[in-house]
């Protein structure tokens, strides 16, 4: 039984015949009869065939047709390797009364053009006198509109090979296109998303309902959300999050980017946009589909500029396409941006992007979780502590932490090339990487972020001021439930005043360190501008940065207080309220309100 048979290509006449041609000696050894089922088992899967003698009656060879197998692809391993005779086993057969199948057609046009009765008759002809097993896939002739037929269930349920006869009842449970079927069979890499459990759960909840239960929401009279807008700084993991959620809910992802849309001739951009939406609609006819628009602010900027007619047409086309999405269709549009204020406001109304999910800069615990996940895949020394690295990586997003770990590994490789004894990534390698990898927030032109932690013990004296700062800032952030239970409203702002050098800035850094928040330092030169409306715009950007990063923004108030003499006496302040200084003051008060 250890005889090795050489695999040869099947005869052209045996294509889609389910025949496995063997020599007479091999058929006698396995006890197979002509036309009876045999199971060919391999490491990559198995194939169900019928035993037939070779025409030349030569032993030592096998020619198998791969019509019915556990894989949707022909088993290429047969073509260039040999198999042992004990891998071919004769099977008993049972006539089936009923069989449930899933049909894979070539395209959506074929699916729409073929009626249910015609499709059922085609499947019946293809399955007549064919042996099948549960979860096996039949590959059909290339001339047929049906590409694959997957066996879902058989009656009676048996471990023997089931024979489909003319009396067998065939039930088509599902009809999908070939493109969707390939997508479902594609083995995507496992995506690990750390420190975004809450955001992932929120996004999954928004996407899961319209994709999998559109009929239920329609019966309840609730329109399904058509779009979700992800907002967050660059590198925080928006694209990775969308891919992970789509994989979890089983959605087909169609990507869309600005460079792939824009064309050189007039109207080409709108045409490309319509093609992508049509592709997403076709995918949604077979299963849940997710259209992902990355950097939507570059694709759909605000309209109204005289020199942006092509962009205005693209925005108008996108609005029309999103309005045309059927609420019963299993399709959701997800867009990502780091500049929500640059998007045309018409996109952000309900009915287009119904929900907005904000992803902020990782907190201390989130950075620690990200670092632990990355360090677990690296050969690190014992002195590498994720919590200690999280303390000194304030302002780092996921992409920054990935670059930091990669650079530390490169430092270890460089040292290993010089010293063969060094093969682990140590804490010194991470500190060396800190010199090269700066956080994304440090590259902003507005203000700066302080990264070196300052603890309360580093400040001598000032115990009364420390206690008041803890009461005003630290306690509301650490114990919000207690404040809510007692009906206390946390203060919205704190004003520190005093002579230069009395540790005002250091106290704010200590508060930010104890609360694990980012610290922004904005000077008067950053805020004020000679151009009308520029100062208010800068202040709005600072406000958005503080909201995204959950940080403390106390230093801007301190900087502004030093500008009070520049505003002039009290009577001059009243005269300046109509000027840009007064406009800036009103913007500041609106932000603090």
Swiss-Prot record:
Pfam family, one: AAA
One of the GO BP terms on file: ribosomal large subunit biogenesis
A single Gene Ontology CC term: cytoplasm
Catalytic activity: ATP + H2O = ADP + phosphate + H(+)
UniProt-listed Enzyme Commission number(s): 3.6.4.10
SUPFAM superfamilies according to UniProt: P-loop containing nucleoside triphosphate hydrolases
Enzyme class per UniProt: hydrolase
Keywords of this entry: ATP-binding, Cytoplasm, Cytoskeleton, Hydrolase, Nucleotide-binding, Nucleus, Repeat, Ribosome biogenesis
Molecular function, one GO term: ATP binding
Keyword Hydrolase listed: yes
Binding site for ATP: 232-239, 498-505
Cellular localisation: Cytoplasm; Cytoplasm, Cytoskeleton, Spindle; Nucleus
Regulation: In the context of 55LCC heterohexameric ATPase complex, the ATPase activity is stimulated by DNA binding and inhibited in presence of RNA.
Role: ATP-dependent chaperone part of the 55LCC heterohexameric ATPase complex which is chromatin-associated and promotes replisome proteostasis to maintain replication fork progression and genome stability. Required for replication fork progression, sister chromatid cohesion, and chromosome stability. The ATPase activity is specifically enhanced by replication fork DNA and is coupled to cysteine protease-dependent cleavage of replisome substrates in response to replication fork damage.
Similarity remark: Belongs to the AAA ATPase family. AFG2 subfamily.
Assembly: Part of the 55LCC heterohexameric ATPase complex. Associates with pre-60S ribosomal particles.
Protein name: ATPase family gene 2 protein homolog B
């Amino acid at each position: 039984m250890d005889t090795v048979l050489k695999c040869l290509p099947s005869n052209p006449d045996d294509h889609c015949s389910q025949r496995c041609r063997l020599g007479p000696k091999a058929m006698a050894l396995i006890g197979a009869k002509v036309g009876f089922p045999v199971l060919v088992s391999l490491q990559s899967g198995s194939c169900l065939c019928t035993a037939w003698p070779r025409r030349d009656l030569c032993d030592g060879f096998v020619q198998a047709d791969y019509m019915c197998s556990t894989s949707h692809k022909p088993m290429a391993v047969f073509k260039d390797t040999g198999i042992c005779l004990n891998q071919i086993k004769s099977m008993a057969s049972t006539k089936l009364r009923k069989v449930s199948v899933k049909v894979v057609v070539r395209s959506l046009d074929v699916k729409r053009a073929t009626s249910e009765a015609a499709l059922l008759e085609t499947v019946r002809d293809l399955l007549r006198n064919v042996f099948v097993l549960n979860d096996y896939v039949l590959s059909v002739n290339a001339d047929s509109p049906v590409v694959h037929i997957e066996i879902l269930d058989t009656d009676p349920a048996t471990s023997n090979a089931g024979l489909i006869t003319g009396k067998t009842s065939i039930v088509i449970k599902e009809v999908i296109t070939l493109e969707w079927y390939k997508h479902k069979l594609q083995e995507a890499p496992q995506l690990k998303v750390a420190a975004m459990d809450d955001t992932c759960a929120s996004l999954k909840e928004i996407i899961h309902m319209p994709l999998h239960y559109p009929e239920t929401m329609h019966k309840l009279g609730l329109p399904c959300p058509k779009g979700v807008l992800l907002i967050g700084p660059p590198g925080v993991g928006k694209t990775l999050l969308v891919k992970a959620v789509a994989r979890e809910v089983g959605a087909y992802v169609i990507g869309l980017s600005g460079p792939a849309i824009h064309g050189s001739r007039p109207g080409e951009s709108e045409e490309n946009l319509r093609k992508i939406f049509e592709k997403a609609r076709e995918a949604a006819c077979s299963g849940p589909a997710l259209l992902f628009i990355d950097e939507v602010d570059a694709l759909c900027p605000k309209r109204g500029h005289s020199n942006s007619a092509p962009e205005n047409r693209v925005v108008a086309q996108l609005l029309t396409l999103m309005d045309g999405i059927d609420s019963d269709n299993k399709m959701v549009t997800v867009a990502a941006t780091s500049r929500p204020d640059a998007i045309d406001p018409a996109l952000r109304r309900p009915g287009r992007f119904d929900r907005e999910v904000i992803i902020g800069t990782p907190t201390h615990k989130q950075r620690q979780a990200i670092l632990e996940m990355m360090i677990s895949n690296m050969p690190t020394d014992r002195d590498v502590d994720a919590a200690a690295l999280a303390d000194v990586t304030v302002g780092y997003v996921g992409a920054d932490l990935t670059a930091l770990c990669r650079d530390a590994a490169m430092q270890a490789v460089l040292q290993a090339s010089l010293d063969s004894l060094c093969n682990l990534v140590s804490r010194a390698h991470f500190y060396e990487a800190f010199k090269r990898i700066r956080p994304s927030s440090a590259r902003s032109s507005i203000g700066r972020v302080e990264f070196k932690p300052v603890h309360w013990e580093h400040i001598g004296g000032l115990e009364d001021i420390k206690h008041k700062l803890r009461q005003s800032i630290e306690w509301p952030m650490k114990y919000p439930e207690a404040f809510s239970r007692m009906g206390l409203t946390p203060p919205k702002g704190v004003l520190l005043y005093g002579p230069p050098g009395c540790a005002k800035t250091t106290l704010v850094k200590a508060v930010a360190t104890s609360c694990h928040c980012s610290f922004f330092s904005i000077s008067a030169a950053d805020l004020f501008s000679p151009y009308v409306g520029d100062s208010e715009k800068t202040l709005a950007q600072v406000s958005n940065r503080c909201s995204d990063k959950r940080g403390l923004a106390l230093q801007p108030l301190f900087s502004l207080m030093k500008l009070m003499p520049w505003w002039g006496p009290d009577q001059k302040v009243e005269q300046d309220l109509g000027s840009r200084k007064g406009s800036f003051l009103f913007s500041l008060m609106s932000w603090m309100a």
